[in-house]
């Protein structure tokens, strides 16, 4: 399939690998798209896995509602659920990066019975992240989350008059992305209201139920974190396993930035394959 639906919304999706292979769903983060997983997908499909990577809510042109409330976390979870149902699989391996990690943590807590394994990258369990916000320098590293609550400031900071995508590209490069990947993502963010839609993930955060963030995860989990990540600091990453009531493995990438799937796709793929093999569908 190249699209799937959740209600009236239509999502673009990469569907690669053997149709009868174990299913892996990969959820991208901000400000990226499904092709941020391409190098990982190539290696997973070579080992017989079927990989599904959607352009998520706000990133797919056919799934770009205008209201902030339409980007609440339960709705992001429902998008993943619709994709997993559309795959025909009873259970899948679920992988996320950045905001995709936030979504997959929430999915694992809502629908653990549909998952064989969970593999979030960069963003730890939400309870660990929230505690780090309150007790460490994570608060200062997350300044942009607070700035993104304003109606126009993030767009102005990142795109200037709306066409100056190089501003965003420079910020991404400063955080460890290659110039090629940063230019690619920034140019797409400058098109057709994409940035405003993507930022609504942040703006809808305050509309959620805080208690849902403290639910303990019961799915076998491997958490990936680069110790040079400028956005997700050690306090939350190192505490992540405290909130997982299942087999847990922490993979620290020494010298790794925030952008692990594209920065180190070979190692990411190797570790994912090990994790999947330990918890087969």
What are these model-derived regions, one by one?
Residues 5, 14, 254:
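Residue-level detector of conserved, well-ordered beta-strand and adjacent loop positions
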Residues 256-265, 269:
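Catalytic histidine-centered segment of alpha/beta-hydrolase-like enzymes
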Residues 1-10:
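N-terminal cap/lid segment of alpha/beta-hydrolase-fold proteins
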Residues 9-11, 31, 36, 52, ...:
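Flexible "cap/lid" subdomain of the alpha/beta-hydrolase fold that forms the substrate-access gate
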């Amino acid at each position: 399939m190249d699209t799937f639906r959740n209600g009236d919304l239509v999502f673009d999706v990469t569907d690669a690998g053997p149709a009868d292979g174990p299913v892996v769903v990969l959820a991208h983060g901000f400000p990226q798209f499904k092709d941020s997983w391409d190098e990982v997908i190539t290696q997973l499909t070579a080992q017989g896995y079927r990989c599904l990577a959607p352009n998520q809510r706000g990133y797919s042109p056919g799934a770009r509602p205008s209201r902030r409330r339409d980007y609440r976390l339960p709705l992001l979870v429902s998008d993943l659920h619709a994709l997993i149902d559309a795959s025909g699989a009873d259970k899948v391996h679920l992988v996320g990066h950045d905001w995709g990690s936030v979504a997959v943590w929430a999915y694992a807590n809502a629908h653990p019975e549909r998952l064989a394994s969970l593999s979030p990258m960069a963003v730890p369990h939400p309870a660990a992240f929230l505690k780090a916000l309150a007790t460490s320098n994570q608060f200062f590293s997350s300044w942009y989350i607070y700035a993104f609550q304003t109606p126009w400031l993030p767009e102005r900071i990142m795109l200037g008059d709306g066409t100056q995508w190089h501003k965003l590209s420079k910020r991404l490069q400063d955080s460890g992305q290659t110039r090629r990947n940063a230019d690619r993502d920034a140019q797409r963010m400058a098109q057709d209201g994409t940035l405003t839609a993507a930022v609504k993930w942040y703006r809808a955060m305050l509309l959620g139920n805080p208690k849902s963030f403290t639910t303990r995860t019961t799915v076998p989990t491997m958490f990936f974190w680069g110790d040079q990540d400028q956005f997700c600091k050690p306090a939350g990453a190192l505490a992540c396993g405290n909130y997982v009531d299942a087999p847990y493995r922490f993979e620290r990438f020494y010298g790794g930035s925030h952008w692990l799937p594209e920065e180190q796709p070979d190692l990411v793929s190797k570790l994912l394959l090990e994790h999947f093999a330990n918890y087969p569908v």
